[in-house]
Amino acid sequence: MGKEYDVIVIGSGPAGYVSAIRSAQLGLTTACVEKWVDEKRNSILGGTCLNVGCIPSKALLDSSQKFLEAQESLHMHGIKMSELAIDLPMMMSRKDNVVKQLTQGIKGLFAANKVDSIVGIGRISAKNEVSVLGENGKNEKYQAKNIIVATGSVPIDIPPV
């Protein structure tokens, strides 16, 4: 049997990590369960939006917008460039750094607010109980007075009419 908490949050996306941090700030013992892991088997916090969705796409859009501005409007300011090129590996590196900085920020907030991060797939297994399937294939059960489900969603295919 794992540790007992006042609050366990399943999912560390925008709703999950904010819920976990706020719960801890209110003095509740808090854990957050996340299934995404890095190559060192540490939790990757932030969910789809931060890691592969909204934030990375906006970082790349920002770089693309800068390129377009340089291409189309800098000459109006008396700035002339002989050669303008996109360095895609550099753009991707910048995007990765933006994501890393934000995920590290969440990790720092978890540490500062004493939120435990649990790696695995969480599910409610009984009243006030969360079962976490770890990468080792073992289930560990945690007790919680309150459980917040913040797992996000996945789209479904709508069958043709």
Explain the meaning of each model-derived region.
Residues 1-15:
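Beta1/beta-strand and adjacent pyrophosphate-binding region of the FAD-binding site
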Residues 2-5, 22-28, 32-161:
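Glycine-rich flavin
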Residues 15-22:
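Short glycine/serine/threonine-rich phosphate/pyrophosphate-binding segments
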